[in-house]
Amino acid sequence: MRVLGGRCGALLACLLLVLPVSEANFLSKQQASQVLVRKRRANSLLEETKQGNLERECIEELCNKEEAREVFENDPETDYFYPKYLVCLRSFQTGLFTAARQSTNAYPDLRSCVNAIPDQCSPLPCNEDGYMSCKDGKASFTCTCKPGWQGEKCEFDINECKDPSNINGGCSQICDNTPGSYHCSCKNGFVMLSNKKDCKDVDECSLKPSICGTAVCKNIPGDFECECPEGYRYNLKSKSCEDIDECSENMCAQLCVNYPGGYTCYCDGKKGFKLAQDQKSCEVVSVCLPLNLDTKYELLYLAEQFAGVVLYLKFRLPEISRFSAEFDFRTYDSEGVILYAESIDHSAWLLIALRGGKIEVQLKNEHTSKITTGGDVINNGLWNMVSVEELEHSISIKIAKEAVMDINKPGPLFKPENGLLETKVYFAGFPRKVESELIKPINPRLDGCIRSWNLMKQGASGIKEIIQEKQNKHCLVTVEKGSYYPGSGIAQFHIDYNNVSSAEGWHVNVTLNIRPSTGTGVMLALVSGNNTVPFAVSLVDSTSEKSQDILLSVENTVIYRIQALSLCSDQQSHLEFRVNRNNLELSTPLKIETISHEDLQRQLAVLDKAMKAKVATYLGGLPDVPFSATPVNAFYNGCMEVNINGVQLDLDEAISKHNDIRAHSCPSVWKKTKNS
């Protein structure tokens, strides 16, 4: 036997240091000596020249690290083997380290434990999920990976879904990576084809025809939609289309009217607003043709009131006084009362009026009653000086200081009482209902102006002060012939449109001569008793700059639009249209046209039904009807003359008229001067 050298002694010392003292089992001296010696084999010298054998060197005998190297002939394997070899020795040497041995249950004996040490694949270093095989090497190992795995130990899964050479793993929609593999899947609403990669859309509308209820089912990629007409919203619970109340969403700037499937915005035209181009917001109706609205308080406007007296004066003078009146007068009106004078007890009166454009005088007292009309026509829009003077035996009427009439009278016009002559004078109207007392009835309304008045030879003292305080009594400085609608009121007429001699039953033939000052407003409207507007002619600003459109409407539907007319000019525009239950014809400066289409016939049927009942005719705007009754509700602003069924309408003959509407005088167009 040979005794192991210092290496083995050092080894045992190391072993003793590794284990705690409490776990060591000490041997007797004899047993310890047996561990440190081994028997030499025969031919030991010859064996030392051969490559070591693991079985011979380290199992049948104990080996130190140098002897272990003779087995492996390289340091890496030796360094790997020897520490594990010592562990096997501690576990399986008879009587040694029983505590350590008890903890080792992988190998049944020393031979198995030692033989397993050089195998780098035991214990398995490869990832069990990812490896296919493990190949032992010199102090190394090689793991062969399954498809879908990579890494030295096959520990990393390959993400096939992110392979640049096979985009999205070849999946048409969803690529799901899994450990060592992947699979394709489809989004909701798609099914996988047999190739397990491509997806096909599911047509839910065909599979379930009633899936949308009363709505329309529209298949879309991966899903379906239940469609409703514009203005409706789909209700999932009832599976039906419900109207959207857009008005509850504050869609309109002023007034909103909701109806099934839509809504319409309206602006208060009577307050000077119109609907903007966006059909939602409101904007001020702008002036397109400025007019000269300058007035003077020295000019008394006789048509301030549609019904009633403009100015009332009372005189108490000495009994020697006689009636006299001097004034300048201007009008385009042909008929109306200039002034009416009477005694305190109403028994005697004098009327100075205009009839047929000429001065007319009617008088009545205890002695006589007379009527005289004469002189030149003075409703020419020029200022004419008029004087009426009671003389001793007659009444003298002069125009421009030239006598035109002398009316004989047997006595004084007004009888003095108690030494005083008391007389009441009324301008442009009667104080009460005196029509029955007149010698010849007359329409008292007169659109005209007077200035430089001198009544009862008392001058104008006290009268100017009264007029100066009231703007609506002031007359325009310059006027032209025509009717003026200021954009703040309407005039109403009762017109019978029935024509028993015509097969059509009724007809509305209208001629308009207009010179608008603003580009939006209702010019003419027929209104039924139920506050509907079966027919209207309106003006609106066009989308084209500096032009206007004419709208013909039945109720709130536009049946025809005449586009892009230049109406806001200093020249009047002439428009004609004729409508009956079957036809609509119109004439403008640009064309004459007969309108015919299927929808028009339906609308004319609506108009025909209304015309068989009672309708009222309005000029310049609408009465109090709902905003939704017509496309336009703003008042017309400008000059306009109207002829209906061959009759020229006189605003003095209207059933009612706003006081601001001027029946026979239209403001002139504003002309800029160099200094303005």
Swiss-Prot record:
Q: What UniProt keywords are attached to this protein's entry?
A: Blood coagulation, Calcium, Cleavage on pair of basic residues, Disease variant, Disulfide bond, EGF-like domain, Fibrinolysis, Gamma-carboxyglutamic acid, Glycoprotein, Hemostasis, Hydroxylation, Repeat, Secreted, Signal, Thrombophilia, Zymogen
Q: What is the effect of changing residue 545 to G?
A: In a colorectal cancer sample; somatic mutation
- Region called Thrombin-sensitive, residue ranges: 88-116
Relate the protein's function as given in its record.
Anticoagulant plasma protein; it is a cofactor to activated protein C in the degradation of coagulation factors Va and VIIIa. It helps to prevent coagulation and stimulating fibrinolysis.
Proregion positions: 25-41
What does the annotation give as the result of altering residue 636 to C? In THPH5; shows intracellular degradation and decreased secretion
Q: What is the name of the protein in this document?
A: Vitamin K-dependent protein S
Q: Which residues carry this modification: (3R)-3-hydroxyaspartate?
A: 136
**Pfam families reported for this sequence:** EGF_CA, FXa_inhibition, Gla, hEGF, Laminin_G_1, Laminin_G_2
Which residues does the UniProt record annotate as the domain Laminin G-like? 299-475, 484-666
In which tissues does this protein get expressed? Answer: Plasma.
| Annotated phenotype, changing residue 15 to H | In THPH5; reduced mutant protein levels and secretion
Q: Annotated site (Not glycosylated), which positions?
A: 499
